[in-house]
Amino acid sequence: MSSEVSARRDAKKLVRSPSGLRMVPEHRAFGSPFGLEEPQWVPDKECRRCMQCDAKFDFLTRKHHCRRCGKCFCDRCCSQKVPLRRMCFVDPVRQCAECALVSLKEAEFYDKQLKVLLSGATFLVTFGNSEKPETMTCRLSNNQRYLFLDGDSHYEIEIVHISTVQILTEGFPPGGGNARATGMFLQYTVPGTEGVTQLKLTVVEDVTVGRRQAVAWLVAMHKAAKLLYESRDQ
């Protein structure tokens, strides 16, 4: 990939919407696959009462729109200002209690797990029915649109074309607890070709530090898949 193309993919611009300032991709086609579109606000003329507590709007009880769902609420039911990274807002924005809770949970992904995905981890990678795995570093691209696999060869998988993400586990530790993560199974399509391509990532067991990083990467990728499916269903 040329540096010029890479820079074009990552270019961003600051825009002002009715909800606040947003840092969005210069080219819409290069937006994050985890992003959400701004909702259509419920028209003011249809907002006579708070959609949570049913308080009637008047001179003293003002209406506010939740920036995530677009519904209208009174100040008491829509007072929290919470980061909303999936819509690219620069500053925390007003959200109803239900949406604020969801956005706070997503903030953990952006603050912690996204960094893990961008840093990458090393796996034994098996393509399709091949019996010979290749040691490769897997990481998410800076614009969050591609999964890069680098070893003796280089592959780019477009995130939006991933259809299946499954963590592979084995056994249970002594004394109970969660099953041990050993890898991940992915299915994805390649534009211009028929059928589904399969990919298996296996954790390298002989390096403790590398294993911890690899398992953290698997967990982060599983969370990313959930956000991806939500964005598709919007």
Swiss-Prot record:
UniProt-listed PROSITE patterns: ZF_FYVE
GO annotation, cellular component aspect: endosome; focal adhesion
Secretion signal span: none
Localisation per UniProt entry: Cell junction, Focal adhesion; Cytoplasmic vesicle; Endosome
Keyword Zinc-finger carried by entry: yes
Keywords for the protein's UniProt record, in alphabetical order: Cell junction, Cytoplasmic vesicle, Endosome, Metal-binding, Zinc, Zinc-finger
Binding site for Zn(2+) 1: 50, 53, 74, 77
Ranges where the record places region PH-like: 107-234
SUPFAM superfamilies to which the protein is assigned, alphabetical: FYVE/PHD zinc finger
Chain intervals annotated as zinc finger (FYVE-type): 44-104
Keyword Plastid attached: no
GO MF annotation list: zinc ion binding
Domain of life according to the entry: Eukaryota
Function summary: Plays a role in cell adhesion, and thereby in cell motility which requires repeated formation and disassembly of focal adhesions. Regulates microtubule-induced PTK2/FAK1 dephosphorylation, an event important for focal adhesion disassembly, as well as integrin beta-1/ITGB1 cell surface expression.
Protein known as: Zinc finger FYVE domain-containing protein 21
Taxonomic classification: Eukaryota, Metazoa, Chordata, Craniata, Vertebrata
